[in-house]
Amino acid sequence: MIRIGQGYDVHKLDYDRELIIGGIKIPYEKGLLGHSDADVLLHAITDAIIGAIGALDIGHFFPDTDMAYKDADSAELLAEIWRQVEAEGFKLGNLDATIIAEKPKMAPYVELMKRRIAELLHAEPSQVNVKATTTEKLGFTGREEGIASLAVVLLEK
């Protein structure tokens, strides 16, 4: 059996936060604002995985009204969901994700992100693809107000 899920996340950029994307700390003057560490890439991936197994969404498992998840490490949240997915007998077929940001440039960090995500999903880096794009200065990402991410995942049982 195969299952496909897609996920999307967006967070506002803020001067008083660290920038963490794909589980990697990226040196930048701004970070992402959110209840957890606001890792848009890991949130999109987590939501895609949850969608693939038909289990609602990330907010159902980790509500932003629950102080237990205040400043939570998104890698730990993804790992928690992945344990449940593996317990149901699924493994990763492949994952494709896109980060949408005008700045900072993501290219220097993409390989580190791929390796970190593969580690969290007990997969090979070749099963994980991460890429980045801009919106050519259009919209909220183009105005550097926020960063978005999309993810598609294929699970196999």
Curated annotation (Swiss-Prot):
Cofactor(s) named in the record: a divalent metal cation
Binding residues annotated for a divalent metal cation, in chain numbering: 9, 11, 43
GO annotation, biological process: isopentenyl diphosphate biosynthetic process, methylerythritol 4-phosphate pathway; terpenoid biosynthetic process
Binding site for 4-CDP-2-C-methyl-D-erythritol 2-phosphate: 9-11, 35-36, 57-59, 62-66, 101-107, 133-136, 140, 143
UniProt family annotation: Belongs to the IspF family.
Function: Involved in the biosynthesis of isopentenyl diphosphate (IPP) and dimethylallyl diphosphate (DMAPP), two major building blocks of isoprenoid compounds. Catalyzes the conversion of 4-diphosphocytidyl-2-C-methyl-D-erythritol 2-phosphate (CDP-ME2P) to 2-C-methyl-D-erythritol 2,4-cyclodiphosphate (ME-CPP) with a corresponding release of cytidine 5-monophosphate (CMP).
Protein's name according to its UniProt entry: 2-C-methyl-D-erythritol 2,4-cyclodiphosphate synthase
